[in-house]
Amino acid sequence: MVPVIWLTVLIVLVDSLQIIPTFHDFQRAKTDLLGLIESVKRGDDLPMIAGTVRLAFHDCIGKGKCDGCIDHSKPGNAGLKRVTDRLDALYDASYKGKISRADFYALASVTALTRSTANLSDKYNGLRKFKVGRKDCSTSPVESIDSSDIPRGSDGTSKTLQFFKSEFGMKTQEAVALLGAHTLGRCSLQNSGFVGSWVDQRFSTAPPGEENLSPTSILDNAYYRMIIDIVPWTQVNINGTRIQWQEPSNSIPNDKLPESKRSPLLLNSDMAISWIIKPSDALGTVSCRPTSLKTPCRHSNAHTFAKIYAKNNALWVKDFTKAFNKMIEMNENKLRKAPIFNGYFDEMNSHDEPINESVDEISEDIF
């Protein structure tokens, strides 16, 4: 009976251990993650930027919050396996036991966001306040417990804002700031049922130059400009299963067009940060229109914040950073500041392998 008791105690102790990476391992992880993000290209787009940010959001939803676990069987998580497969391969090969998977996922997103503003005047500085020590779920990287439902893009204003309040304890302004992450990436029919990207070149803050990334890989306030500066959005039916908003000048549904001809889109949850959106069916159909004389939409309480962010990119990046950090710091463990150089101790405890030199030049500019 005694061995069984000791085994139980050992399991409890192992389960409660908090992994804090050394300075050396933390620096190597940042560099290797940047290399991975840079290695996956689609023209001038780096899809892992949007992919890791989306992963962080989905990882932080549910009972365990940011716990390094994703239930890939849930429709709302469709498409994330391409992201986790790449991250998990790197993690399992080089960082397992040195940093928690939850920390690794969160660090990937923050590294990606840092890369997304590398050529911009308004920099994302979330790495400066990054914390470590997140606890993985017991079945990491696979989610084994029932988690919260992923918010749907077809949800209206009330449900969208309530989700951020219930899940992350966020006020309306914080929710509006966090939703600005939609400036990154695009929707695909096979993953979400929607089609298109939220932004295009019109409102990009990137300076002219061949080295610039696609607008879908740049963290700026173009998303708010699309909502505030382009008022006459109209609803279209996608594949008979979803309703999304497109500009009237491009009213052909995006799923019927080649990618080069597609219009930027907004979801109900995006329109919610400016308008009171009340879907009348499961598709997300809304009876009002922003410019309609007969059935005009009324502005929501979030509209004021969307207007502010549309006019002030620097302020939005600052507020987004705070909201994003608030989200990724949710975990049952008490987190600590990321390790800084601690002289002799870290030198003696570091590993002998050199840091990935292929991205050293990029790393110096970004980190």
Swiss-Prot record:
The keyword Disulfide bond belongs to this UniProt entry's keyword annotation: yes
Site entry: Transition state stabilizer: R54
Q: Which UniProt keywords apply?
A: Disulfide bond, Glycoprotein, Heme, Hydrogen peroxide, Iron, Metal-binding, Oxidoreductase, Peroxidase, Signal
- The positions flagged as glycosylation sites are N119, N239, N356
At the top of the EC hierarchy, this enzyme's class is: oxidoreductase
The cofactor note reads:
Binds 1 heme b (iron(II)-protoporphyrin IX) group per subunit.
Leader sequence range is: 1-16
Q: Which reaction does it catalyse?
A: L-ascorbate + H2O2 = L-dehydroascorbate + 2 H2O
- Cofactor (UniProt): heme b
Instruction: Report the record's disulfide bonds.
Output: C60-C66
Q: In Gene Ontology terms, what is a biological process of this protein?
A: hydrogen peroxide catabolic process
The record's active-site residues are H58
InterPro entries xrefs: Ccp1-like (IPR044831), Haem_peroxidase (IPR002016), Haem_peroxidase_sf (IPR010255), Peroxidases_heam-ligand_BS (IPR019793)
PROSITE patterns tied to this protein? PEROXIDASE_1, PEROXIDASE_4
Its Enzyme Commission number? 1.11.1.11
What is a GO molecular function of this protein?
Answer: heme binding
Q: What's the miscellaneous note? A: The gene for this protein may have been transferred horizontally following an endosymbiotic event early in evolution of the Hydra lineage as an RNA or cDNA intermediate.
Family indicated by similarity: Belongs to the peroxidase family.
What's its job? May play a role in the protection of oocyte incorporated cells from rapid apoptotic degradation.
**Designated name of the protein:** Putative ascorbate peroxidase
Q: Identify the species of origin.
A: Hydra viridissima (Green hydra)
